[in-house]
């Protein structure tokens, strides 16, 4: 998971994706025990934006320790998805955001099953784009596929007691 010259829009110096300024990475310390995660992973984010519509993407990543072959560690994408803000509460009744207002969105990843081995890290990457995997959101609120312009969205993920953004991992207890 490192940019390179083959990446659309990437420029030197190439960096790990988690270190990009448009990616917010949450990562555990190295795990002290094997940890099994099996089922749907749910992410609840409190977010705000300068735009009336925008996207939030999440990736669950198994971060292997550094090795001779991978001096920065190996970063295995397990599952990822996207949530368009206008559809945060309903696919049939879209609702635009009010710029600057905090709202809670729920992002559910497809079911997965992985044993994060001792010494590995669990990482969740949050961004507003995962192009070309998902289409680009013009952030205008215009009808999907019929936009006439694009605007930049400055997005914020809020944390803390008033805005408890969180990840719900289905951890299977060791036997």
Question: Each PLM stretch: what is its role?
Answer:
Residues 1-175:
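Intrinsically disordered, low-complexity Ser/Thr/Gly-rich stretches
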């Amino acid at each position: 998971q490192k940019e390179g010259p083959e990446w659309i829009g990437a420029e030197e110096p190439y960096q790990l994706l988690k270190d990009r300024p448009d990616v917010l990475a949450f990562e555990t310390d190295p795990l002290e025990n094997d940890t099994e995660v099996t089922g749907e992973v749910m992410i609840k984010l409190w977010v705000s934006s300068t735009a009336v519509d925008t996207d939030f993407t999440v990736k669950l990543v198994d971060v292997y320790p550094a090795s001779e072959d991978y001096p920065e560690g190996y970063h295995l994408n397990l599952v990822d998805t996207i949530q368009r803000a206008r559809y945060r509460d309903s696919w049939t009744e879209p609702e635009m955001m009010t710029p600057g207002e905090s709202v809670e969105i729920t992002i559910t990843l497809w079911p997965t099953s992985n044993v994060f081995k001792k010494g590995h890290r669990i990482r969740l990457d949050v961004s507003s784009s995962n192009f070309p995997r998902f289409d680009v959101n013009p952030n205008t609120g215009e009808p999907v596929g019929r936009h006439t312009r694009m605007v930049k969205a400055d997005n914020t993920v809020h944390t803390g007691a008033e805005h408890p953004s969180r990840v719900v991992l289905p951890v299977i207890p060791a036997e």
